[in-house]
Amino acid sequence: MLYSIGKVVQTHGIKGEVKIKPHTDFDRFVKGFDVIIKDTKYKIQTVREQKDLLLVSFVGYPTLTDVEHLKQQEIYTDEEPLDLESDAFHLPKLIGLKVYDQHNYLIGTVLELVDVPQGYLLRILRDDNGKTVLIPFIDKFIKSVDETSIHIETIEGLI
């Protein structure tokens, strides 16, 4: 089974580096680690941080031309997810979870995670009217996450 761990958002420079937006709260991007992009395995050669992104190069791909085709591609691993701390989770596992407000009222179901420069938004299909809403995935709104549901704190105009 494959597990999504990030996305190549852009190339960087001329020496075969790519910018990666990780989907995980823990470090999967280390030298020597194998990742899968478009059904091909790549071994990580170097990793360095740049703001909320990682700059990564792969063994055997030394030029911009070598990595150009990786732009906007999801990155996977075939290794089991690591055990997480109690306040961490695997972002792809949020899809399909039920979302409740602070009064335990069912708002809807998570359809997808939208990656924006500020972080992630949850696209939720509303249970009451079939419309979708976007909720910022930040501590101000997300109060708890478990294996079956997400509880949020709503404010006027959020939903």
Curated annotation (Swiss-Prot):
Gene Ontology, cellular component aspect: cytoplasm; ribosome
Record-annotated PRC barrel domain positions: 86-159
Chief place of localization: cytoplasm
InterPro entries linked to this entry: PRC_barrel-like_sf (IPR011033), PRC_RimM (IPR056792), RimM (IPR011961), RimM_N (IPR002676), RimM_N_sf (IPR036976), Transl_B-barrel_sf (IPR009000)
UniProt keyword annotations, A-Z: Chaperone, Cytoplasm, Ribosome biogenesis, rRNA processing
Record GO terms (molecular function): ribosome binding
Localization in the cell: Cytoplasm
Classification via SUPFAM superfamilies: PRC-barrel domain (SSF50346), Translation proteins (SSF50447)
GO terms (BP aspect): ribosomal small subunit biogenesis; rRNA processing
Subunit structure: Binds ribosomal protein uS19.
Membership in a protein family: Belongs to the RimM family.
Domain-level remarks: The PRC barrel domain binds ribosomal protein uS19.
Described function: An accessory protein needed during the final step in the assembly of 30S ribosomal subunit, possibly for assembly of the head region. Essential for efficient processing of 16S rRNA. May be needed both before and after RbfA during the maturation of 16S rRNA. It has affinity for free ribosomal 30S subunits but not for 70S ribosomes.
HAMAP family assigned: Ribosome_mat_RimM (MF_00014)
Protein name per the record: Ribosome maturation factor RimM
Organism annotation: Acholeplasma laidlawii (strain PG-8A)
Gene name of the encoded protein: rimM
